[in-house]
Regions:
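Terminal "cap-and-tail" regions of soluble proteins that handle hydrophobic small molecules
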Residues: 3, 7-11, 61, 97-171
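Short, solvent-exposed coil/turn segments
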Residues: 1-3, 32, 47-49, 62, ...
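Hydrophobic-ligand binding "helix-grip"
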Residues: 28-29, 58-109, 113-115, 170-171
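Short, hydrophobic/aromatic-rich segments at coil-to-beta transitions
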Residues: 45-53, 72-81, 153
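Conserved short hydrophobic interaction patches
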Residues: 23-24, 72, 143, 147
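Hydrophobic ligand-binding cavity/cleft-lining segments
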Residues: 1-44, 167-171
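Anionic, Ser/Thr-rich low-complexity intrinsically disordered regions
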Residues: 5-6, 36-40, 56, 79-82, ...
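Amphipathic alpha-helical interaction elements
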Residues: 19-22, 57, 129, 133
Length: 171
């Protein structure tokens, strides 16, 4: 099983970064790793126990995954695990922790565990899968950083107008 923890400095508050990832109408504007994400039941953002279906983007369009949220504590922590399997993953789990950064902005701490399958080929494919997953994760959060650099004020204005009745704590 491959495990990693990557820290990404972000140019916005924990609240803004959390919402830009978990509210799908924001995420669709920057996340080219995923072409489509939808929560069972159509909610605009997750909650504990919510299941999402995601389809890969770009060269990874053939990949799809269903995940269940095991933690959702806006704006500090979200964690999910894969439901079932989705080649090349036999197991996948990740968490995103958000902390305020000294001097402004925040830190997004992304931790993941992945296991590649099938089991008989794990020794061969898991190092490759881990390398590609890590590289795509770094690119993905660099795109989020660029989006936040240009649009954090727009997200903050939306947060002030949105009552949050459907997704956790009011803003």
């Amino acid at each position: 099983m491959a495990h990693d923890r990557i820290i990404f400095p972000m140019p916005a508050s924990c609240e803004v970064v959390f919402d830009v990832f978990h509210y799908h109408h924001w995420r669709a504007r920057w996340d080219s790793l995923v072409s489509h994400t939808e929560l069972d039941g159509g909610a605009p953002c997750p909650s504990v126990g919510a299941v999402s279906a995601s389809t890969g983007g770009g060269l990874l369009r053939a990949l799809s995954m269903r995940t269940e949220f095991v933690s959702y504590q806006r704006p500090r922590l979200a964690a999910a695990r894969m439901v079932g399997t989705s080649f090349p993953f036999s197991r996948w789990a990740a968490s995103m922790k958000h902390e305020r950064a000294a001097g402004g902005g925040s830190l997004l701490i992304y931790t993941y565990n992945i296991e590649a399958g099938p089991r008989l080929l794990r020794w061969l494919i898991e190092p490759v899968v881990h390398h590609v997953f890590r590289r795509q994760t770094v690119k993905r959060f660099a795109r989020m950083h660029a989006f936040l650099s240009a649009h954090a004020a727009e997200v903050e204005a939306w947060q002030r107008a949105y009552h949050g009745a459907r997704c956790g704590d009011p803003l």
